Amino acid sequence: MATIYATGKRKAAIAKVWLTPGNGEMLINGKTLDQWLGGHETLKMKVRLPLEATKQLESMNVKATTLGGGYSAQADALKHGITKALVEFEPSFRAILKPMGLLTRDSRVVERKKPGKKKARRSPQFSKR
């Protein structure tokens, strides 16, 4: 079977994912998942979720490059990319992944700062007298 390519996005992070049938090897930016995320167990679980849900954790190799954003956003982008690649690999996985909300792109991004405000919505302190 050929290599499947997909992209995932979250906030400012973009993940390019290549999925191939194999032995469950994961390389992100040239590092293994444990080297890349260190002690962030929740983020590792988040990345593995689509593969575990479809029982493909031991039978798919994942090669990915991530850029932009922080570790959490990159992990979410990677999860989104893996999910899209799995659905392209086997369309029947859509029925498993769609109800879990993994195919939906999380469109929440940082709200811009407005003039006259301290942050996006925080106003300067108001004094009546």
UniProtKB/Swiss-Prot annotation:
Belongs to the universal ribosomal protein uS9 family. GO terms for cellular component: cytosolic small ribosomal subunit. The keyword Ribosomal protein applies. Residues 107-129 are annotated as: Disordered. Keywords: Ribonucleoprotein, Ribosomal protein. It comes from Sulfurovum sp. (strain NBC37-1). It holds the Pfam family Ribosomal_S9. One of its GO terms (molecular function) is structural constituent of ribosome. The gene is rpsI. Residues 114-129 have a biased composition (Basic residues). InterPro entries: Ribosomal_Su5_D2-typ_SF, Ribosomal_uS9, Ribosomal_uS9_bac/plastid, Ribosomal_uS9_CS, Ribsml_uS5_D2-typ_fold_subgr. It comes from the Bacteria. This is Small ribosomal subunit protein uS9.
